[in-house]
Amino acid sequence: MTAPQKHNLFSPEPHYIPGYAGFYPQLRYRVGDTYGRTTAQLLTDPSVQKSPCSVLAPVAKPKFIEDFSKPKPPFVPCRDLIEPYIPHYTGLKPYKNFEMLGRFPPQEADAQGSLGGENVSRQVPLPAGFMPYPPYAPCPPGRKGDSRDLGHPGLRLALGEEAWKSTAPACEAPGQYQLYHCRRDESPPLAHWQETLDVGRFHRLPQLGHPKLIQRKAISGYAGFVPRFAWVMGMNYRDGVTQAMDEFDKSQFLLRNPICALGERLPSTHWPSNTIYRSQGLIPFYMGFIPSMQDNYALTFGNSTRKAYQKELERRSRTL
């Protein structure tokens, strides 16, 4: 049983699908066929040299830097999360410094003394995740004595009336001192800020001494038009552009503000160029701006420019 015949409308096999934007040396001057038929002719023509690699296929096999086929090694956490400290570590150790800030009450002192003093925390097993020291330095136990030793007035309120009545320190029985961990955040003291806030430092655009200084800075390689610019031997491009822009600014200032005595007619430099206003009109397809021509309609380009020329003559006759 024979396979069904393919319609002539379809491109014969083998062929490339449209969308390839590469370079075909043989496709330069071929016209009249579709892309598929042309590529089919090139692929079946024995006189055309072909590469063993297809155009749409990658030229080389992609190289993978990382091998994903092997299993990954087990994750090893950082030593800081496992060990309490690192050998030879010389950085900050919180709760390192001790201070004698108060005494235990008598019953607690006896209990602490019977357990062995400083080795209490090492003998009592602590649950996992337990912080042996509070996150903030605790307040020492209050002492009924001089109110100046209590510090903040809130402590005096907490101790009651006896802290306010007696001013002489009360005699206390000798007992074991309680050790507290005091967190010391050692940092240099902040300098007194005396300067006022300078709002000008937050300006995004720089403060320029010359107006339009950003537009006057030319970039090397710029091929656009620079007025009054001329190539001078031995002068840098940026210096030449700066000098040309200075001359252009001066000429524009004199053009807008001509020098003439009071009562005299304005000089010829005040008027626009004579190439715009001519009696014979301008040629069509002129894309420049022609003053007093925007209100004209139902006229050709030549008649519109002639009418603009007449309006300009009338305006000059009414001006000094």
UniProtKB/Swiss-Prot annotation:
Keyword Cytoplasm part of the UniProt annotation: yes
GO biological process: flagellated sperm motility
Main location: cytoplasm
Keyword Calcium: no
Cellular-component GO terms for this entry: axonemal A tubule inner sheath; ciliary basal body; sperm flagellum
Disulfide cysteine pairs (residue numbers): none
Tissue expression from the record: Expressed in sperm.
Compartments reported by the entry: Cytoplasm, Cytoskeleton, Flagellum axoneme
Keyword terms: Cell projection, Cilium, Cytoplasm, Cytoskeleton, Flagellum
Coiled-coil region list: none
Any one Pfam family match given in the protein's UniProt record, by short name: CMI2B-like
Complex and partners: Microtubule inner protein component of sperm flagellar doublet microtubules.
UniProt record similarity statement: Belongs to the CIMIP2 family.
Function: Microtubule inner protein (MIP) part of the dynein-decorated doublet microtubules (DMTs) in flagellum axoneme. Binds to the intra-tubulin interfaces.
Protein name as it appears in the record: Ciliary microtubule inner protein 2A
Gene: CIMIP2A
